[in-house]
């Protein structure tokens, strides 16, 4: 093969643009053709914080009424059969029990934070109840 003379070409001082691969070109043009949009994903913990703020603002009951009512009737049957409850009595029980549970979880969270953790554990609830004097 005969040698050919190379001619110098003018340099612009930057790299020549690369040619796109066929897969990249197809990938970039796919959403424009009406592909399904991926749902927005929040960072871990963001949704939990939104829920915390939402439930702290609200005053509605968090436990469903009918399952709670069934639980009350089931527990009451152990003491006496054929007991009847006024709806206001069940609501008062539910308000009191939810207030107790919210307070218990607040104190339990403080115990977990004191132990340099962010997740509550059964031992935190046990410690909280022991400090409160509910369980010896």
From Swiss-Prot:
The modification N6,N6-dimethyllysine is found at residue 5. It is found in: Nucleus; Chromosome. The modification Phosphoserine is found at residues 11, 29, 58. The keyword Phosphoprotein applies. Acetylation is generally linked to gene activation. Acetylation on Lys-19 (H3K18ac) and Lys-24 (H3K24ac) favors methylation at Arg-18 (H3R17me). Acetylation at Lys-123 (H3K122ac) by EP300/p300 plays a central role in chromatin structure: localizes at the surface of the histone octamer and stimulates transcription, possibly by promoting nucleosome instability. Asymmetric dimethylation at Arg-18 (H3R17me2a) is linked to gene activation. Asymmetric dimethylation at Arg-3 (H3R2me2a) by PRMT6 is linked to gene repression and is mutually exclusive with H3 Lys-5 methylation (H3K4me2 and H3K4me3). H3R2me2a is present at the 3' of genes regardless of their transcription state and is enriched on inactive promoters, while it is absent on active promoters. Residues 1-39 are annotated as: Disordered. The modification 5-glutamyl dopamine is found at residue 6. The modification Allysine is found at residue 5. The modification N6,N6,N6-trimethyllysine is found at residue 5. The modification N6-methyllysine is found at residue 5. The modification N6-methylated lysine is found at residues 10, 19, 28, 37, 65, 80, 123. The modification Phosphothreonine is found at residues 4, 7, 12, 81. The keyword Acetylation applies. CDD domains: HFD_H3. GO terms for cellular component: nucleosome; nucleus. PANTHER family: HISTONE H3 (PTHR11426). Belongs to the histone H3 family. This is Histone H3.3C. It comes from Cairina moschata (Muscovy duck). The lineage of its organism: Eukaryota, Metazoa, Chordata, Craniata, Vertebrata.
């Amino acid at each position: 093969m005969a040698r050919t003379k190379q001619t110098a070409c003018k340099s612009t001082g930057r790299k020549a643009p690369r040619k796109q691969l066929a897969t990249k070109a197809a990938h970039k043009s796919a959403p424009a053709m009406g592909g399904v949009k991926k749902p927005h994903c929040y960072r871990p913990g963001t949704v939990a914080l939104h829920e915390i703020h939402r439930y702290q603002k609200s005053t509605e009951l968090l436990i469903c009424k009918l399952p709670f009512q069934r639980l009350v009737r089931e527990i009451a049957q152990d003491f006496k059969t054929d007991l009847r409850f006024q709806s206001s009595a069940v609501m008062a029980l539910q308000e009191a029990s939810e207030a107790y549970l919210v307070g218990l979880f607040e104190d339990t969270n403080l115990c977990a934070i004191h132990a340099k953790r962010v997740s509550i554990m059964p031992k935190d609830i046990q410690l909280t109840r022991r400090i409160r004097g509910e369980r010896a």
